[in-house]
A protein has these predicted regions:
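Short, solvent-exposed loop/turn segments at secondary-structure junctions
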Residues: 9-13, 76, 100, 152-154, ...
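Conserved core of the PLP fold type I
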Residues: 35-176, 187-206
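Glycine-centered flexible beta-alpha turn that most often forms the glycine-rich phosphate-binding loop
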Residues: 183
Length: 264
């Protein structure tokens, strides 16, 4: 009998597409050639941003403007950039009451005050409970800054936030003037019989949602590629504190070539 470790969000090593990535590497090097002497820039390799946009369109029905996409070294770098640039020490951040330990560690490092919101293990974060918390803060003249949520296959419960709850969450964000950071790290590994509901980013009409995704869960954490999507002016605000001169163009080009041939 095989042992299966549920402690880390990693694909099965036996499914890693080594041969296809070797082919993608050859194509990427051939296409990039001498351009690899240049820095990729804050937004990252355009070919991978185009793939991110196309993959989002396949699932959500609308493309992402590639100038709103920034490639990062995994989704944790995305979260670090977003939270570091939108929050100040002492800010109140709302999260699901059970949440990924890496995000908690980052929020603690930034000296924020974390408030957990009740959720159930099927439909996700409870918007009624969230509203009660927000009304209580409002009565004390306290204003939370943002809510961090994992709507698809929430870690650790596996809950999928229903469409109704997603819409309520956006309404509450508008009413109480909150940002939403949508961590969609597990959205690509859905095996439920019905399609998962539309992303908060797609449903958002008031520029409150910043979308985060990763290639770690569908390809491999060692690839270290993720991305965030933010509309103006927040895309520039978030990238303002970025000093790495961009994520590896070579790694990005290899993954882009791979997914162009393997979008399904």
């Amino acid at each position: 009998m095989n042992d299966f470790a549920f402690t880390g969000g990693r694909p099965d090593p036996d499914t890693f597409p080594t041969e296809k990535l070797i082919e993608a590497s050859a194509k990427a090097l051939q296409n990039l050639g001498g351009n690899l002497v240049n820095y990729p820039g804050d937004n990252g390799y355009q070919g991978l941003r185009e793939v991110c946009s196309l993959r989002f369109e396949r699932r959500e029905g609308v493309p992402l403007p590639i100038d709103q996409i920034s490639i990062t070294s995994g989704s944790m770098q995305s979260l670090d950039l977003i939270l570091r640039n939108l929050l100040e020490p002492g800010d109140i951040v709302l999260t699901e009451e059970l949440v990924y330990s890496g995000t908690l560690g980052l929020l603690r490092h930034l000296k924020t005050n974390i408030v957990g919101v009740p959720l159930d293990y099927v439909e996700g974060l409870d918007p009624d409970a969230l509203e009660e918390i927000l009304i209580d803060f409002q009565g004390k003249n306290i204003k939370p800054k943002l809510i961090y949520v994992t709507p698809n296959h929430q870690n650790p419960t596996g809950a999928i936030l229903t469409l109704e709850r997603r819409k309520r969450l956006i309404e509450l964000a508008e009413t109480f003037d909150l940002f939403i950071v949508e961590d969609d790290c597990y959205g690509d590994i859905d095996f439920t019989p019905e399609p998962i509901p539309s992303s908060l980013f797609k449903l958002d009409q008031s520029n409150r949602v910043i979308y985060v995704a990763t290639f770690s869960k569908i390809l491999g954490a060692g690839v270290r590629l993720g991305y965030f999507v933010a509309k103006s002016p927040y895309d520039k605000i978030i990238s303002n504190d970025r000093w790495d001169l961009g994520t590896s163009a070579l790694s990005s080009a290899i993954v882009a070539e791979f997914f162009r041939d393997n979008l399904d």
